Design a protein with these regions (language model features):
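Short Gly/aromatic-enriched secondary-structure transition segments
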Residues: 105-109, 232-241, 292-301
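Extended hydrophobic
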Residues: 218, 268-284, 392-425
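Well-ordered beta-strand positions in beta-sheet-rich domains
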Residues: 78, 247-249, 317, 414-419
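Detector for small/aliphatic-rich hydrophobic stretches
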Residues: 11-180, 409, 420, 424
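Short, solvent-exposed amphipathic alpha-helical segments in soluble enzyme
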Residues: 298-299, 386-387, 421
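Sec-dependent signal peptide recognition
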Residues: 2-10
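Short beta-strands and strand-coil junctions in structured, solvent-facing domains, enriched
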Residues: 290-291, 414
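Non-catalytic, conformational "gating/processing" segments within enzyme and secreted inhibitor domains
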Residues: 115-289, 304, 308-391
């Protein structure tokens, strides 16, 4: 296996089609693009009450669990996704939704706050995520978020929609001629994605996903690189991992860490910090033979209790496999099943974008790559589950399927999450 890149790339792409008619700044080293942008400046100090912040966090966790369960039913192996990335892209779309389309989206995405306060909460989260930790080398820790919207050339956009995007997401709209030249437009958008991911994801939109009916494309990219605060020794030996499909031998890291270790009924967990203490990886390992049941039984309350249980436990020993894999999935059916089918049909109402009901969602595409090694990552329980510290000796052996969460510590936001059922894949 080639040297791990220590990175995570999360990309969400959303395309909208028109029902008739033809109706961040330009990336470097590419031809300049025409950008439509509000005269409004980004709100750099959004006002979000503590109550709204708590509601926003709970809502996000609820959607992340819904998404996890939906992907679990359709993905047989390892998978990775980012609720933060998916929600941000769809929140930009939600800003233009109206009537029952908006109601369905709010229900499916767990957007319970009023629209103005919701967008302010997304803005506050984005600003918090992209604030670099003090006195930390960028080579050791980077977390970057980028949003872009691409619209049919000559397509009218309401000023209020542009204002919302500018003030809360720092985004404008790039013009492309999808109607006449869909392939060059697709190349331009894929080029933007490649720039944001340092060319690790060169083709977000494969041929055919953008065509002459496309009128609007939303893209959200998250780049994460984090060295472990305490790195594992190099040259990890092979060890057995009890995968769902049978035992495999995989490179397995052994290291002493000041990781938090804690446990509950049927599971053990660890939290490994990244340099700068801005983010941590939380690993949750269900008891042997209980992984499927643990996944199925997860609730917002039980998952909240698990994630809140991390506390310093002194020197600890963590034994875990190296792993790397990619996820590439269309979310159309998933989002429809979660309760927003109207957005994908001719009856969709995105009149908040252009003042007319002639847009619907064509595709929502999510791509992710993760690599975890000795250096770092560049990328069950009923309600009221009991949580307690693991007694000494403090050792967690991750030799069976597990869940992982990469959490932004200051906000508690889950940046990335997924499962590893076979690290050899």
């Amino acid at each position: 296996m080639r040297r791990a890149l220590n990175l995570i790339f999360l990309i969400v792409g959303v395309t909208l089609s028109g029902c008739g008619g033809s109706d961040g700044s330009s990336p470097p080293d590419r031809p300049p693009m025409n950008e439509l942008r509000s005269t409004k400046l980004r709100a750099t100090a959004p006002v979000v009450s503590s109550e709204d912040a708590a509601t926003f966090a709970t809502d996000n966790l609820a959607f992340s669990l819904d998404m996890y369960q939906a992907l679990r039913s359709s993905q047989s192996g390892n998978f990775l996704f980012s609720q933060a990335s998916i929600s941000t892209a769809l929140a930009m779309l939600y800003a233009g939704a109206a009537t029952s389309t908006a109601t369905q989206m709010a229900d499916a995405l767990h957007f319970s706050l009023p629209a103005t306060r919701l967008h302010a909460a997304f803005n506050a989260l984005d600003l918090a995520l992209t604030t670099p930790p003090p006195k930390t080398n960028a080579a050791a820790f980077r977390l970057e978020v980028a949003n872009s919207i691409w619209i049919q050339k000559g397509f009218s956009v309401l000023p209020v929609y542009l204002d919302t995007l500018a003030e809360n997401y720092g985004a404008g709209l790039f013009e492309e001629d999808f109607a006449a030249s869909p392939e060059p437009a697709r190349d331009a958008i894929n080029g933007w994605v490649a720039d944001q991911t340092e060319d690790q994801i060169p083709t977000l939109f494969p041929p055919g996903t953008i065509d002459t009916s496309t009128r609007l494309v939303l893209a959200n990219a998250v780049f994460f690189h984090g060295d472990w605060k305490i790195q594992f020794p190099k040259n990890s030996p092979n060890a057995i991992f009890h995968a769902l499909s049978g035992d495999v031998f995989v490179p397995t890291m052994h290291g002493d860490h000041n990781a938090a270790l804690w446990s509950g009924a049927g599971w053990n967990a660890a939290a490994l910090d990244y340099v700068g203490d801005t983010a941590s990886m939380i690993i949750v390992v269900p008891d042997a033979g209980t992984f499927a049941g643990f996944e199925t039984s997860l609730t917002v309350e039980s998952l909240s209790a698990i994630l809140a249980g991390a506390r310093p436990s002194g020197t600890s020993n963590v034994i875990m496999p190296r792993f790397s894999f990619a996820t590439d999935v269309s979310l159309n059916d998933t989002l429809s099943a979660l309760g927003m089918p109207e957005a994908f049909g001719d009856g969709a109402d995105f009149s908040g974008i252009n003042g007319a009901r002639n847009l619907h969602v064509q595709s929502v595409i999510h791509k992710a790559i993760i690599a975890v090694d000795e250096k770092g990552t560049t990328a069950s329980a009923a309600t009221g589950v009991g949580v307690g510290l693991v007694s000494a000796p403090a050792t967690l052996i991750v030799d069976r399927p597990f869940l992982f969460f990469i959490r932004h510590n200051a906000t508690g936001a889950i940046l990335f999450q997924g499962r590893v059922v076979d690290p050899s894949k």
